[in-house]
C-alpha cells in the first residue's frame, strides 16, 4: 500500500508532458478528502455511487427555481399495469398477457413510462365506479404542480364506450401523490367533462399509454 507519513499533507502525482511539468492527480489527506484528477476519468467497469450520493452539477449555471443539482438515481425496468374501479384492482378481470406490459426509465426524479393493456374479460362491474389503470412502480410527488397528462390510444371497437359521455376527447391524468391513472372525457371547448366509469369499459379493452411524471 501507499501511505503518507506527514500529517495534513496532500499526495500529488506529477509527470512530464512534452517538457512541461503536470499534476495528474491530487489526493487530499484530510478525513473527508477528495481525489482531484487533472483530466477525464476512464473506467473499464461500472462506476458505483453509494446510496444518497450522486453526480454533482453545482458548477453549472442555475435556473431561478433550482432546488437540487445532484443526479442521484437511475433505474430502468418492466412493470405490469392492472385495471381498477374506484381505486381497487378488479380481481376477476382477465388479461391478454401478450399485450399487457410496460417499461419505464427513471432518471433522478423524472420517470418516463409506456405500457399497453388488453382485456379478454373485464370482470365484475359495480355501477358508477370510476375507471383507473394502476400498477405503477412509483408514486407521483405530493405537489399539485406535478400533475401529468397521459398520451393514449384507444383502439377502436376494443376500448371505452363514450356514447353516453360528453362528446369530446378521452384524456388520461396522473394526479399528484398518486400511483394510478384516471380517465375523463372533456368536451371540445374545454368547459365541461366527466369521469369515465368502469361500466364504460369494454370486455376487450385495448389501450396504449405513454407518460412521464415527477416522483417524491
Region spans (language model):
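Short acidic, glycine-rich loop/turn motifs
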Residues: 4, 15-17, 59, 83-89, ...
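Residue-level detector of buried hydrophobic side-chain packing
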Residues: 27, 111-115, 136, 211
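Extracellular attachment/recognition segments
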Residues: 138-186
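Beta-strand-rich receptor-binding modules of extracellular spikes/adhesins
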Residues: 1-49, 103, 110
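Surface-exposed ligand/attachment interfaces on beta-rich extracellular proteins
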Residues: 19-20, 59-70, 78-106, 116-142, ...
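Glycine-rich, low-complexity segments
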Residues: 32-92, 141-145, 208-216
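Domain-scale recognition of soluble eukaryotic interaction modules
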Residues: 176-216
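Short, exposed beta-strand/loop patches in secreted or surface proteins that constitute
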Residues: 47-48, 101-105, 169-176
